[in-house]
Amino acid sequence: MSVSLVVIRLELAGHSPVPTDFGFSAAAGEMSDEEIKKKTLASAVACLEGKSAGEKAAIIHQHLGRREMTDVIIETMKARADEVRDTVEEKKPSAAPVSAQRSREQSESVNTAPESPSKQLPDQISFFSGNPSVEIVHGIMHLYKTNKMTSLKEDVRRSAMLCVLTVPATMTSHDLMKFVAPFNDVIEQMKIIRDSTPNQYMVLIKFSAQADADSFYMACNGRQFNSIEDDVCQLVYVERAEVLKSEDGASLPVMDLTELPKCTVCLERMDESVNGILTTLCNHSFHSQCLQRWDDTTCPVCRYCQTPEPVEENKCFECGVQENLWICLICGHIGCGRYVSRHAYKHFEETQHTYAMQLTNHRVWDYAGDNYVHRLVASKTDGKIVQYECEGDTCQEEKIDALQLEYSYLLTSQLESQRIYWENKIVRIEKDTAEEINNMKTKFKETIEKCDSLELRLSDLLKEKQSVERKCTQLNTRVAKLSTELQEEQELNKCLRANQLVLQNQLKEEEKLLKETCAQKDLQITEIQEQLRDVMFYLETQQQISHLPAETRQEIQEGQINIAMASAPNPPSSGAGGKLQSRKGRSKRGK
């Protein structure tokens, strides 16, 4: 036998206090609180990520629908042993101070006189108003069931916490304690939760171990609370109990969980095992059996007048059309059908609210099972779909029911074959996906190795780049310096060339002047040499004459020089005389 575990989520308003010791998880030993919270809010975080504050508020309001937050009263009752242990632990630290104070007071009473009674009164007296075990919070209680069934075998982990879904309000806390009295020794704590649902409350019972919870489940599940009333104890295993704020996305859908509506007549949760769900136009849901016992046309809860025709005020919340409307049985959202704009189906995709009812004929559609569930119920023994027992007496209605049942059987068989086909296809896809994942992992490892090698190479190249940049900077500095020096040298060369031209012109002029000066000097030297020769000749002649006798000198002084004609050659005898005369003439010129 298998059961579905439930998840209880308390969605609180922003200003509401958080109840103490409400959180629980059957997988607490396997996962930490942070991991559990992260897994719980994964879909909500993914849905709200990257949205603005206005968009987040709109999404949260869309999933809340017409549900309103009310006061939820939580009464906690702990085991007696725990209370005794807590009391002892509270008294232990104060035992020594009390004894010391008493001894100090006794010693003071011996040494001093007793004081007046007014002085012995304490300055401050502590007191507590109200019941400390009762907490009042403001929010909405959500009940989810897991899509995966859990076996009731002993070796399968389930939970150490059970939930009594519907306890009648006629049962007081004292009556409830009597009901669970045989298991008082193994119960750690009980939490009685009262919300806006009238005439009932819910109880969370935490046991010491899962074996104790299994014993209580086997003994009390389906058992009447007392022999007078017909109400029975409906127990479910609690996989997780959590408290979340509304702004964190507590009303958003949770992966692998389905939120269950409840019948407002019998106050029982409406699971797929209890089909025939009907929701009136005033947004109250009932079991088909509960509503059939109501002969009036008004709503059993609010006395709203029901009519078979669609109300004109009803319209799609998205596009505003008033035909082919479907109402969500979880939050009351009204959307158009798949033949208009598919807003009802889009609401299911966004919120995972499974059941929707057509407003015109009250037919209920299950989006998860993809079939109608308003005329079919599931047998509790074998789980097969059986015909809903209609109380109508007309033959026409029986024929219609038979046709509907036949169509449902045909649809079920076809869906079963489709399920097998798609499951096989999913297996093949999973196999191919696993191979692709392995290939991608291999490629990923290779890519990681390449990235590591490229990173090493990149680091080396960066170092080389830095060294080259430093060298380039140095070379640029040197080039700039050399360019400056080259400019200076070019300017200097230009100046030198200009000076060279000036000097060359001056040199030419100096050479020309030197030549003229040299020519003049040569002429002067020639004249001076001739004069010097004449002087030397004169001096030599004078010396020679000075050595001659006096008569000769006188003869020379008185002698005359005659210049003969050049045509007749001179006789040899006159040669000496000619020479003598020329010398005399020179000597005279010299004198």
UniProtKB/Swiss-Prot annotation:
Residue spans, zinc finger RING-type: 263-303
Pfam families on file: BRAP2, zf-RING_2, zf-UBP
Catalysed conversion reaction: S-ubiquitinyl-[E2 ubiquitin-conjugating enzyme]-L-cysteine + [acceptor protein]-L-lysine = [E2 ubiquitin-conjugating enzyme]-L-cysteine + N(6)-ubiquitinyl-[acceptor protein]-L-lysine
Binding positions for Zn(2+) 2 per the UniProt entry: 328, 331, 347, 353
Record key words, sorted: Coiled coil, Cytoplasm, Metal-binding, Phosphoprotein, Transferase, Ubl conjugation pathway, Zinc, Zinc-finger
GO BP, sorted A to Z: MAPK cascade; negative regulation of signal transduction; protein ubiquitination; Ras protein signal transduction
MF terms (GO), sorted A to Z: identical protein binding; nuclear localization sequence binding; nucleic acid binding; ubiquitin protein ligase activity; zinc ion binding
EC number(s) recorded for this UniProt protein: 2.3.2.27
Record field: transmembrane: none
UniProt main location, coarse: cytoplasm
Zinc finger (UBP-type): 300-392
Biased composition (Basic residues): 581-591
SMART domains (UniProt xref): RING (SM00184), ZnF_UBP (SM00290)
Binding-site residues, Zn(2+) 1: 316, 319, 336, 343
Biased composition (Basic and acidic residues): 82-93
Known role: Negatively regulates MAP kinase activation by limiting the formation of Raf/MEK complexes probably by inactivation of the KSR1 scaffold protein. Also acts as a Ras responsive E3 ubiquitin ligase that, on activation of Ras, is modified by auto-polyubiquitination resulting in the release of inhibition of Raf/MEK complex formation. May also act as a cytoplasmic retention protein with a role in regulating nuclear transport.
Oligomeric form and interacting partners: Interacts with the nuclear localization signal of BRCA1 and with the N-terminal of KSR1. The C-terminal portion of BRCA1 interacts with DDB1.
PANTHER family in the cross-refs: BRCA1-ASSOCIATED PROTEIN
Protein name: BRCA1-associated protein
Organism: Mus musculus (Mouse)
High-level lineage: Eukaryota, Metazoa, Chordata, Craniata, Vertebrata
